[in-house]
């Protein structure tokens, strides 16, 4: 992968917020998804239950609400970690240190690390898939950009000596924070192979 700082900048919203949303449209969306996917073995306990287990951040510390990412200089990222209420948990400058060839989804993932002071040490190391689709796709009718990631106080907690993920089924996910409710619903629908809405249900 080619690291491009611009791909990461901006506001990011934790996918977990979609799972607990009380907006009628998102609840309708999940109801339809649950019905459409209930026969699949992976979703036997329920679609939302599956994703809450896969994407959950509570076991690693405070439940995340999202990130705010700005350019710290020409290459590095200043990442502000937000809690579920949108309040800052930590903020530090992260340096791109390389890649993991077989990371989340078996794809190349970017490795970031900060040497800055942190209140929450689990934010020291960040492993993340490049955002997909590109952020610009949204302007042309594409889905919101999203990415899967993992984080820990050190790399040994994320990657074993064999170069494989220590927790291969842990999939915290961030989505472009600029998305409308319709765009958020359509991510959920597309994930489960349902037709995207052209407008919110009434």
Q: Where is each model-derived feature located?
A:
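Short, Lys/Arg-enriched charge-dense amphipathic segments
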Residues: 18, 22, 44-55, 187-190
